[in-house]
């Protein structure tokens, strides 16, 4: 939920319908925005005084979505095909490129597109190649872990670790791998009341609270 009590929700492009991510008549491959009663709060529709639920488009498989209170921004990560996982800053009406541009290739090794960037396409804040398979995501700007202020935590399923992206003035300054010693798939992360929690998945999955040294 955003501060105005509207809801953002993501949708994938359905694997076999990748071109629909570019279509404004399809809700596949989109970030959608609506009120709690379901009323669309996205882009203008075709009729007068109508709206769609589409907020941004050109997404492949968006998953993590987080609102940054300090700047009122929304960050989103999404899975690329083979390589090309992305972190994006979400803006109303912006095109994020899939499948016209990508930093990855198809699972067969063939090109999805020969282009990594194009005019009119919003470029990602950060990319991961090879893929890390990003999972849960959480923003931290508290006082309990002062060295981690202004950091985005992203679960990395493939690497079985957490990636910390350090931000300064809205730009990623560096990336750090954490908690690899757990050797567990990181499914989700949450920040609550200045506390950081990690959820792992498996038959022995755990909910772990991170404690200061």
Residue positions per predicted region:
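Short alpha-helical "switch" segments that flank and position catalytic residues
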Residues: 189
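Beta-propeller domain segments
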Residues: 4-8, 13-176, 184, 194-198, ...
């Amino acid at each position: 939920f955003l501060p105005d009590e509207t809801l953002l929700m993501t949708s994938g492009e359905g694997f076999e319908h990748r071109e629909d991510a570019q279509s404004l008549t399809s809700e596949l491959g989109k970030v959608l925005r609506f009120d709690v009663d379901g009323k669309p709060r996205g882009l203008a529709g075709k009729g007068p005084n109508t709206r769609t639920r589409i907020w941004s488009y050109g997404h492949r498989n968006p998953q993590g979505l987080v609102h940054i209170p300090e700047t009122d921004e929304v960050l989103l990560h999404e899975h690329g095909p083979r390589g090309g996982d992305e972190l994006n800053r979400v803006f109303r009406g912006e095109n994020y490129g899939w499948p016209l541009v990508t930093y990855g290739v198809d699972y067969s090794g063939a090109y999805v597109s020969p282009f990594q960037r194009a005019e009119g396409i919003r470029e990602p804040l950060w990319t991961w190649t090879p893929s890390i398979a990003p999972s849960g995501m959480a923003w931290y700007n508290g006082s309990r872990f002062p060295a981690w202020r202004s950091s985005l935590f992203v679960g990395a399923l493939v690497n079985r670790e957490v990636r910390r992206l350090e931000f300064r003035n809205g730009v990623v300054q560096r990336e750090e791998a954490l908690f690899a010693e757990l050797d567990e798939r990181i499914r989700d992360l949450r920040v609550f009341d200045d506390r950081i929690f990690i959820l792992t998945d498996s038959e022995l999955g755990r909910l772990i609270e991170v404690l200061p040294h």
